[in-house]
């Protein structure tokens, strides 16, 4: 191996914004609820903060949801911090649900227009300790909080964040077996 072979690994990294550093601080200390209270009814959130949060949501949405542990509070956070969607109604798919959560009415916020992406999530980690589900829903424009950002498109996920209570005609297309190693 030559020194030149390492050039691709030694490329300059993009600068982390102050907004992202702040959000990482909030996330690492599980201070989301306090943060929501501090911005509620305050001055409007900057575009830079919304874009930084959107990237963090794409990367860590499941963990943020788990840390907040209250979908009504999470919905408030998403409504305040995500860039506003300005598009048409869509048919969306979700594979990020397992049967236990679905049966409890806990439907997730992240959906895609690409059924193959939803299938991947339905068969994967989301089929842990319970069968995975592939869902289809009609999403009126008013139900979509944010469309895909550049990072989501780069990952090939084309993730739309929605208010699940505003979706209609949610149907289970397929059920995948529980992939837990130990049952």
Model-derived features with residue positions:
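Conserved NAD+-utilizing ADP-ribose enzyme module
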Residues: 1-91, 98-109, 115-183
């Amino acid at each position: 191996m030559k020194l030149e072979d390492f050039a691709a690994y030694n490329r300059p990294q993009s600068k982390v914004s102050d907004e992202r550093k702040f959000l990482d601080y909030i996330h690492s200390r599980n201070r989301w609820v306090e943060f929501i209270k501090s911005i509620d009814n305050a001055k409007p959130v900057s575009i830079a903060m919304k874009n930084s949060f959107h990237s963090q949501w794409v990367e860590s949405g499941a963990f943020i949801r788990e840390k907040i542990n209250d979908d009504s509070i999470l919905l408030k956070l998403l409504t305040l911090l995500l860039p506003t969607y300005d598009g048409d109604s869509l048919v969306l798919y979700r594979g990020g649900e397992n049967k236990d959560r679905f049966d409890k009415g806990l439907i997730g916020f992240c959906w895609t227009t690409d059924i193959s992406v939803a299938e991947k999530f339905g068969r994967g980690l989301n089929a842990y300790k319970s069968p995975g589900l592939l869902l289809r829903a009609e999403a009126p424009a008013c139900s979509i909080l944010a469309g895909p950002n550049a990072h989501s498109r780069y990952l090939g996920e084309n993730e739309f964040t929605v208010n699940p209570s505003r979706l209609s005609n949610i149907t289970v297309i397929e059920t995948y077996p529980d992939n837990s190693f130990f049952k």
